[in-house]
A protein has these predicted regions:
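Short amphipathic alpha-helical "interface-anchor" segments enriched in bulky aromatics
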Residues: 60, 224, 231, 299-330
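Electropositive, glycine- and tryptophan-enriched low-complexity nucleic-acid-binding patches
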Residues: 21-22, 78-173, 267-293
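An internal, acidic/charged active-site-proximal segment
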Residues: 124-272, 361-370, 411-413
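Long, low-complexity C-terminal extensions of enzymes
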Residues: 367-413
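Short, conserved catalytic/metal-binding motifs centered on acidic residues
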Residues: 10, 50-64, 91, 177-185, ...
Length: 413
């Protein structure tokens, strides 16, 4: 269909039985999109003996007005500002060999659950001054187990979504790693993912206070020393260097280091990969800290798996550009949920169509042009007498369906 993807637009392009009332009932019905997406992915897109990751990201949908369910002010990375919008958590299955992400489910983020608290406007500030606590550690307090952290409402929301996805996937595909951006570069998020039975691959802050494990011999007095020397990002040990490549055109030298390190706010050791880039002309230097809780994972796979997380952005791009994620005008909870999930399902559906050899090289624009052509041919032949042969219909369909396509189909649909 052309133009804005709304309920009215869908009804106009639908065949018999696709009236506006029918479309409206569809978007107000309860649909298990996660299971539906998984059934489609399992049947048409999964490759045997391939490696798959579970990835997550947030998508922000711009929305004006006042009455949309979940409407609030969220940060948009595209606009680089906070704006009035709807926010969703997306969980996707990422194929390492196919280099593609297949959306499983979108769940709406409500601001209270993201922040972890709800402001109580009725509560008044107490005028009485609180007694100041004494300096230092309270007497009799014990060490806190960093593995037994209390999850915020937002992390519980993410955890429940991951567990829901794993219920379908683990019967067919063995998922080991969960990939997320730097927002999960903290101990609470790491423990949340580990409670789901997965290892995490994410990013730490550039100035993270990492330390090498202590290698000194135990002196025999007191608790054994756990932390060794702190990391110096400008002078990384050469013994941990894994790759050193220089691009002669851009004059950028890329060094990759891998080492097991400790962070005082994390419960366990981390598999750290530092990607250092140096301008060979100016000498300017920058770096990125990636990490995984799997201490046996190689540096190349950590870099590769983390970069594959960006494939989810292409799901968002196609959902917004072609399938109505930015166009819908519904304001109630269920229709909003159905629209966002239908949009991402159509991205999976387009991947499934391209499994057909005749449509393998076609883009989404080509697929839409192809379907437009077939629709026009069908409407034209309805106006003609019943004299057209099947061969004529097939030949005309093949010609018209390829009009406007950049990569035309090799065969008639």
């Amino acid at each position: 269909m052309r133009g804005r993807i709304t309920m009215l637009g869908v009804s106009r392009w639908s065949e018999k039985g696709g009236s506006y009332s029918t479309i409206e009932r569809f978007f107000n019905s309860n649909i298990d999109w996660g299971l539906l997406n998984w059934k489609f992915i399992k049947t048409h897109l999964i490759r045997k003996k391939s490696i798959y990751l579970l990835g997550g990201d947030e998508v922000v949908i711009s929305k004006d007005g006042k009455h949309s369910y979940g409407l609030d002010r969220f940060y948009s990375s595209l606009e680089n500002r906070v704006r009035k919008s709807l926010a969703f958590l997306n969980i996707s299955l990422i194929g390492v060999d196919a280099r593609k992400a297949y959306s499983l489910i979108n769940k709406q983020i409500i601001k209270e659950s993201k922040e972890g608290c709800v402001k109580d406007k009725s509560a008044k500030k107490s005028k009485s001054k609180k007694k100041k606590n004494k300096r230092g550690r309270p007497k009799g307090s014990g060490n806190k187990d960093k593995k037994e952290v209390e999850l915020s409402p937002y992390l519980k929301f993410v955890q429940n979504t991951i567990k829901e996805a794993l219920q379908w996937i683990n019967r067919e595909v063995n998922i080991v790693y969960f990939v997320y951006d730097g927002a999960f570069g903290n101990n609470s998020a790491v423990q949340m993912v580990k409670r789901c039975g997965l290892d995490i691959i994410s990013k730490l802050q550039k100035n993270s206070a990492l330390s090498f494990p202590n290698e000194e011999k135990y002196s025999g007095r007191g608790a054994p020393k756990k932390y060794g020397e702190d990391i110096d990002y400008k002078n990384l040990p050469e013994k941990h260097l894994k790759s050193d490549v220089t691009d002669e055109k851009s004059h950028i030298q890329t060094k990759i280091y891998q080492m097991e390190m400790l962070h005082r706010k994390f419960a366990d050791r981390l598999n750290i990969v530092i990607i250092q880039k140096i301008d060979t002309i100016t000498g300017k230097m920058t770096h990125v800290n990636l990490f995984s809780t799997d201490l046996t994972l190689g540096y190349d796979k950590i870099v590769d798996y983390y970069s594959l997380r960006f494939q989810i952005e292409f799901v968002f791009r196609d959902s917004k550009q072609y399938w109505g994620m930015e166009d819908f005008m519904n304001i109630k909870k269920t229709p909003i949920y159905n629209w966002t999930n239908l949009s991402s399902f159509m991205v999976n559906f387009a991947h499934g169509l391209r499994q057909n050899h005749a449509m393998k090289g076609m883009s989404i624009l080509d697929l839409k042009a192809h379907c437009h052509g077939l629709k026009y041919v069908k409407e034209v032949f309805k106006l003609l007498p019943d004299l057209a042969s099947d061969y004529l219909i097939e030949m005309v369909s093949a010609k018209i369906a390829n009009l406007g396509a950049i990569h035309p189909s090799e065969k008639v649909a």
